[in-house]
C-alpha cells in the first residue's frame, strides 16, 4: 500500500477532519460527514474529540470471541474517560472449524479488510479486539500496515462446551 504521509508543513488533521471524501470542497465534505454521524446522536463537542476506532471480530460463528461485547464496552469507557470518542466497527471474523475450505486465506483477507477500514475511516488510533490463531495475526498484520497507532487486545480464553 502507498504511504499516506503528509508532504506539506500543515498540521495533521485529526478526528472527523482527516481523510475527507474528495468532493472538491473540504467544507462540504466535512458538513456531509457531520450530518450523517449526528444522526447517531453525537454532539458537536463529542465530534471535536480525537477518534479512537474499536474494531472487533465478534460473530455467532466464532465461539472464541463470545466475550467481545463486554470487552468493547470496557474499552469504550476507558476511551471516553481519556476524552476521546470511541467508534466501533466490525471486520471479518474467522474460526477454524467454520471456515471452508481453510481459514488461512481468510486470514489474509481479514488483514486487508482491517487495514483498509482503519485507513478509510477518520480515526486517530485504533484498538483491535480479536482472538484465535488467525484473527490475531491478521490484526497484527493490519496494524503494521495501516500507519495508525494501534493496540491489539486479545479476547482471552474461550469457554469450552
What are these regions (language model features)?
Residues 2-49:
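N-terminal amphipathic/basic leader segments beginning at the initiator methionine
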Residues 12-21, 52-59, 89-101, 118:
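Gly-rich Lys/Arg/Thr-decorated short loops/hinges at beta-loop-alpha junctions or inter-strand turns
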Residues 26-30, 34, 48, 65-73, ...:
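Electropositive phosphate-/nucleotide-binding environments in soluble metabolic enzymes
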Residues 32-40, 80-128:
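Glycine-rich oxoanion-binding loops at beta->alpha junctions
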Residues 40, 56-58, 71, 89-92, ...:
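Fold-independent oxyanion-binding glycine-rich loops
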Residues 44-48, 52-53, 59-88:
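Glycine-rich phosphate/diphosphate-binding loop of Rossmann-like nucleotide-binding domains
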Residues 104-161:
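Active-site cavity-forming subdomains of large catalytic enzyme subunits
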